[in-house]
Structure formats: structure tokens, C-alpha cells
Curated annotation (Swiss-Prot):
Name of this protein: Glycine--tRNA ligase beta subunit
Protein keywords: Aminoacyl-tRNA synthetase, ATP-binding, Cytoplasm, Ligase, Nucleotide-binding, Protein biosynthesis
InterPro entries: DALR_anticod-bd (IPR008909), Gly-tRNA-synth_bsu (IPR015944), Gly-tRNA-synth_heterodimer (IPR006194)
Subunit relationships: Tetramer of two alpha and two beta subunits.
PROSITE patterns attached to this UniProt entry: AA_TRNA_LIGASE_II_GLYAB (PS50861)
GO annotations of cellular component type: cytosol
Protein family according to the UniProt entry: Belongs to the class-II aminoacyl-tRNA synthetase family.
Any matching Pfam family: DALR_1
Length: 689
């Protein structure tokens, strides 16, 4: 089998930097899927992405599809011909589908009789005849939320396309993609190297682009250069570069030939909270801040240029000139905001609507204040501090700094509270109220901050569900899924003794008559328990374990988590499968009984040795496990219950549950009911697969 390397490069105008990597990897995945569907063998698919191009290179691609032998079995001979020996309609229809006549069909003898069969050899098509359509379909299936047209063309893509190159080895695959004819022209860097050049062979890519066009097409190579050079530059200044993965990817997507440089800003700006300076450096300018070894911001930053002049001074001075007004703005806002206390901004919250039916931000603030105090009391936090933090929680939204730099909400509240002389725990809570902001983010450190964070999240959940605006599909404008998961993480990971239903009831009362959904408590609790399913599945917990616990609907998250861990452990035991089956059998037996089932076992009615053994062990475990259940120590409880496997098996082997004697029957049902209730103290084990 002969192979060649294949190249597909799509030259465009500047692609969206935040989407570039996703587009490139999706392009490669789509091509790989298409090749597999076409039956074409290959070694691997490489992807390349730069601001003005997407490309894939398929290594060692077979130059043709394999030849295939097909065999299509038709109707039995007995059903293929009528009494006169003429083909039946079934036979003719089958033959027509195979592209032959009935007379051309072969016959296949089997143990079950003789059948019509069509055998054929299908020659594989040359790969060069397939790749145009494969690339076209791969591009059409890219995750592009918003397409655009350009010029007088009807074709649509994420950005205007200027060049297309499809090469199988050295052979140009002709045709059009997105209205552009495939050719050998590759465009280089806008300012460095050759503007355009010709590529003769797929093997030349991407090196020829680097050598002639001054473009590093390999996204990961550019990324590695930026990361290494940035770390080296920061180290030379005695600091450490703050390089987040998302920002690094975005910067990598903005440059074709990275040149890492450092610049400075005036030290007077360091009097402004570092978060505000960093916000504008990262968010607006795509710079990397530099910190000293103690985590203090240095008056330097790193930026990445797309050109590499002999003298970089003008570029450095240009970037310093651009960032200076933004830092000056932050300085002005900070100094202006400090002229009034946070508490003085409370009345202005009355002018901002949280939600039309739920009132203003001042209304929300008062609810948070009250609920934070309730939660603080339950978890052993300082109630007065929690209420104070709740009262001030949204005041920084009225400051100039947060109005201009929205992502500094919370953290600026902390700085302003410190300036006002507020208690440190209160000040920190103003920042930590939004934690966790995203998956994997840190949780609030103190119980006071946890109280405020939970109060804020529960207020939003209760309010929005209370007016009947639960998330639908992927739409979640109030980020309720994030709020629910964040609240669960705080309660579980800090092992807080909180009950979801109780908190939602207290939250509901604070809305007075604003809520219209009478089932708001159940709706919020069910929604939050549903978020547990996604959380545990991400952790690799089996779905049936989660379902087994959900069936009991425990509304204390820490308790829910303890049950999940216990059942997950139980599932690994040798006896788990048999006990799950036994629980299912018990459940089915009890489900058929009409009326109330007693759990009172009468020892005088125990006739068979096997039922005596089970009854005695069940009764003993009732007393033994009660303290474990009370303390939420579910794993040792299930370990003890796992020891019942043999005695349960013996019971079902030797004892007739549905005895004719009513008293015997009811007593045996009571044994099973007591047994099942012991397991149900943890979860519905019958749901384990």
C-alpha cells in the first residue's frame, strides 16, 4: 500500500483569537472522522492554527481506498420463485437494490436452506478524488456560532477566505472550497518574510512557511515559545510572570511569529489595588503581569509582539503609552471612590433593579443580610459579622472602579472596606462572597464569608425559581446552575450542617409576597440535588450509585455526600451484587402488598432456622447501627449490612415468604420490611446495577 502526506491549508483574514484553537482541533477531528468513514488508513492527523490560517496535515495517508468484497444475502430460494419458477416481487426488489437481475444472483447453501446471494468486488477510489469533499464537509461542520459573507460571494465562513491549498504529496488536488480555487499559493506574515510563495509538496509544510513566510503555523510551538520567553524575562527582572492558560492561548492566537518583550509603568500606580491594575493589563491589553517572590505586583509587564524589529524601543514605548491612561483611570477611580464609605452607597442600590419581580439590589442586599445571619448561626460563624458583610456585599457595585472594571467586583469591596476600617473578616467576605466563581475555583476561607456566599446564592436560586423562571435547555441567564453547584461545594467541602430545604424556606420567607411559585422549596431542592448528579459523574462516581442515594432524597448536602461515598465503597464489595439483587427482590415482594406493612417481628412465629437467623441478625443490627446512622457513619454501617449476604440467601432458599398462614406471612413480610428499612437508612441499594 502506497502512502503520501496530505495537506489542507485554508488562508483567511484574522480569525477570532478566543476560538482559534477550538476551530483548529475541530477541523482535525472532523477530517479524521471523515477519513475513517471513507475507509482510508493514515498514521495521524496534525493540526495547525495561526491568526490567518487553519491547516491539517495527514501523515502517511493511503493513496486509495482498499478493495472491498461484499456479499448481500437475499430471500430464500423457496421464497424467491413462485410455483411456475418465476421470480417473486421480493426477489426482484432485492435484485434491483443490488443493481442486478435475479438471474445474475448466485446461490448460497446453508444448514437452513438455499438463499440468493450477490457477491461483488468494489474497487477503492483514489484518495485524491475524495479529499476535496472530505475537507469541504469538515469545514462545514466546524463549531462556528456566527458566519459571515464577503464580497459578492454566497459562501459563508467565520472569516473571509483568500487561499486554499490541497496537496496529496506533490499533487495539487483541484477544485473549489468556499468559492476559492485550490492552488499552491501560501501567504506569509503580513510584515515579515515573503508575502506569498508557492508550495511544491505537502512534506514542506509547515517548515516552508516558517522559512519563507516567517509564520510559525504550529500553535503549540508558538505557545511554548511565549511561555518560556515570558518566564525567562520575568526571572531576569527578579519576578514571576502571571500566565493563565486561557490568556496564553489567546495571545498565542494573536501572533504569527512571537516576540516577547517587557515594559514598565510608573511605581505610583502600585498604590492602586493590584487587582484593578491586573484587570486592565490582562483583560484590555493582553499583557502578563509580573510579581515578586512575595506575590507583590512589580511595575513591569510582559507583552508579545507580532514583529521583531532590530530596535524594539518604539514598540515598548508604544505599549507603555497605551497602558498608562488605563492605569491612570484606575488610579483616579480608586482615589475618588475612597472619598465616601461603602455604607454611604447603600441608598444608591435602590436605583438598580435586580429583577423586576424581585426588587432592587437594595432589596436583595437586605435579604442577603438576614439570610447570612441565619446561616452563620447554624454553622457557628459570627452572626454580627455575617450580617455586616451581607449589608455591604453589593455596595462596591456603585463605585466608579467596578462600574468601569466590572470583574473587580468583590475584590474592590474588600479594599474599600479595609480603607473604611471594617473588620478584616467582614472585608474579606466581600471578596469571597462570589466564590467559587468557576469550576475548580477556591472556596471562601472563613465561615463568615461562607455564610454570605451561601446567602447570595440561595437568594438568587429561591427568587428566580420563585417567579417560575427555572433554567430551560442551555439557557441559564441568572447562572443558577453555577450558583447551585457553588453552594453545594461550600456545604460539602466544608462539611457544614445545613439542610437545603430549611435554607430555602427561610429564604422564601424573606421575599414576602413577591414569589408566585407555591412549589419553590421542592423545585429548588430538586434542582440542587440534580446538580449533584453532574458533579459526581465528573468525579467518576457510577450513575447507579447517585441514583440509589437520590432515591432517598437526603436534603443535607454533607449527608448526601457521605451516603454517596459509602454506597460507592459498598459497590466494590464482593457481596454487593447479590445484596442489590436481594434488595430488588424484597422491594418487589413488598410492593405487591396492599396496605401498611408492619416492621414488628414476632419471635414466637419464627419457625424455620433460616428465618430465625435472619430475624435475629436484623433485630441485632437495628440496635447496633442506630448510632452509626445518627452520626452519618454510613460506610461502616453498610459494611456490617454486607455481612448479611449469606443469611439472606439462605432465607430465600429455604423460607416461603407468602405462606398460607396469614400470621406467618405477615411476620415474614415484617422481617423483610425491617431488613429493607435498614438499607434505606443509607440508600436504595436495589437500584445498583
Amino acid at each position: 500500500m502506497t502512502t503520501q502526506n496530505f495537506l489542507a491549508e485554508i488562508g483567511t483574514e484574522e480569525l477570532p483569537p478566543k476560538a482559534l484553537k477550538k476551530l483548529a482541533t475541530a477541523f482535525a477531528e472532523n477530517v479524521e472522522n471523515e477519513l475513517n468513514q471513507a475507509g482510508l488508513t493514515f498514521e495521524k492527523v496534525q493540526w495547525f492554527a495561526a491568526p490567518r490560517r487553519l491547516a491539517v496535515k495527514v501523515l502517511n495517508l493511503a493513496t486509495s481506498q482498499p478493495t472491498k468484497e461484499i456479499e448481500k444475502r437475499g430471500p430464500a430460494v423457496s421464497a424467491a420463485f413462485d410455483a411456475e419458477g418465476k421470480p417473486t416481487k421480493a426477489a426482484e426488489g432485492w435484485a434491483r437494490g443490488c443493481g442486478i437481475t435475479v438471474e445474475q444472483a448466485e446461490r448460497l447453501a446453508t444448514d437452513k436452506g438455499e438463499w440468493l446471494v450477490h457477491r461483488a468486488t468494489i474497487e477503492g477510489q483514489p484518495t485524491k478524488n475524495l479529499m476535496l469533499d472530505i475537507v469541504t464537509r469538515s469545514l462545514a461542520n466546524l463549531p462556528i456560532p456566527k458566519m459571515m459573507r464577503w464580497g459578492d460571494k454566497t459562501e459563508q465562513f467565520v472569516r473571509p477566505v483568500h487561499t486554499v491549498s490541497l496537496l496529496l504529496g506533490g499533487e495539487l488536488i483541484e477544485g473549489e472550497i468556499l468559492g476559492i480555487a485550490s492552488g499552491r499559493t501560501i501567504r506569509g506574515h503580513r510584515f515579515l518574510g515573503e508575502a506569498e510563495f508557492q508550495i511544491a509538496h505537502a512534506d514542506e509544510y509547515p517548515q516552508i512557511l516558517k522559512d519563507k513566510g516567517s509564520v510559525i503555523a504550529d500553535f503549540n510551538e508558538r505557545r511554548a515559545i511565549i511561555l518560556a520567553d515570558s518566564q525567562a524575562k520575568a526571572s531576569a527582572l527578579g519576578g514571576v510572570a502571571d500566565i493563565e492558560d486561557d490568556l496564553l492561548d489567546e495571545v498565542t492566537s494573536l501572533v504569527e511569529f512571537p516576540n516577547v518583550l517587557t515594559a514598565t509603568f510608573e511605581e505610583r500606580f502600585l498604590a492602586v489595588p493590584a487587582e484593578a491594575l491586573v484587570y486592565t493589563m490582562k483583560g484590555d491589553q493582553k499583557y502578563f503581569p509580573i510579581y515578586d517572590k512575595n506575590g507583590k505586583l512589580l511595575p513591569h509587564f510582559i507583552f508579545v509582539s507580532n514583529i521583531n524589529p532590530t530596535d524594539p524601543t518604539p514598540i515598548i514605548e508604544g505599549n507603555e503609552k497605551v497602558v498608562r491612561p488605563r492605569l491612570s483611570d484606575a488610579e483616579f477611580f480608586f482615589n475618588t471612590d475612597k472619598k465616601q464609605r461603602l455604607e454611604d452607597l447603600l441608598p444608591r442600590l435602590e436605583t438598580v433593579l435586580f429583577q423586576q419581580q424581585l426588587g432592587t439590589l437594595l432589596d436583595k442586599t437586605k435579604r442577603i443580610q438576614a439570610l447570612a445571619g441565619e446561616i452563620a448561626t447554624q454553622i457557628g460563624a459570627d452572626k454580627a459579622k455575617a450580617e455586616r458583610a451581607g449589608l455591604l456585599s453589593k455596595c462596591d457595585l456603585m463605585t466608579n472602579m467596578v462600574f468601569e472594571f466590572t470583574d473587580t467586583q468583590g475584590v474592590m469591596g474588600m479594599h474599600y472596606a479595609r480603607h473604611d476600617g471594617e473588620d478584616e473578616e467582614v472585608a474579606v467576605a466581600l471578596n469571597e462572597q462570589y466564590m467559587p466563581r468557576f469550576a475548580g475555583d477556591n472556596l471562601p476561607n472563613s465561615l463568615v464569608a461562607s455564610s454570605v456566599a451561601l446567602a447570595d446564592k440561595f437568594d438568587t436560586l429561591t427568587g428566580i425559581f420563585g417567579i417560575g423562571q427555572a433554567p430551560k435547555g442551555s439557557a441559564d441567564p441568572f447562572a443558577l446552575r453555577r450558583a447551585a453547584l457553588g453552594a453545594l461545594r461550600i456545604i460539602v467541602e466544608k462539611n457544614l450542617p445545613l439542610d437545603l430545604a430549611e435554607i430555602v424556606k427561610k429564604s422564601t420567607a424573606l421575599f414576602a409576597d413577591r414569589l408566585t411559585n407555591q412549589n419553590v422549596v421542592d423545585d429548588v431542592v430538586d434542582f440542587m440535588l440534580g446538580r449533584f448528579r453532574a458533579w459526581y459523574q465528573d468525579e467518576g462516581i457510577a450513575v447507579d450509585v447517585i441514583q440509589a442515594v437520590l432515591a432517598r432524597r437526603p436534603t443535607k448536602p454533607a449527608d448526601f455526600d457521605a451516603r454517596v461515598r459509602a454506597v460507592s465503597h459498598f459497590r466494590t464489595l464482593d457481596s454487593a451484587e447479590a445484596l442489590a439483587a436481594a434488595n430488588k427482590r424484597v422491594s418487589n415482594i413488598l410492593a405487591k402488598i396492599e396496605g401498611e406493612i408492619s416492621s414488628k417481628i414476632d419471635r414466637t412465629l419464627l419457625l424455620e432456622p433460616e428465618e430465625k437467623a435472619l430475624a435475629e441478625q436484623v433485630l441485632a443490627l437495628q440496635s447496633e447501627l442506630a448510632p452509626l446512622f445518627a452520626k452519618g457513619e454510613y460506610q461502616p454501617a453498610l459494611d456490617r449490612l454486607a455481612g448479611l449476604r449469606e443469611v439472606i440467601d439462605n432465607f430465600f432458599d429455604k423460607v416461603m415468604v407468602n405462606a398460607e398462614d396469614e400470621k406467618l406471612r405477615q411476620n415474614r413480610q415484617a422481617i423483610l420490611n425491617t431488613l429493607r428499612n435498614l438499607f434505606l437508612q443509607v440508600a436504595d441499594i436495589s437500584l445498583l446495577q
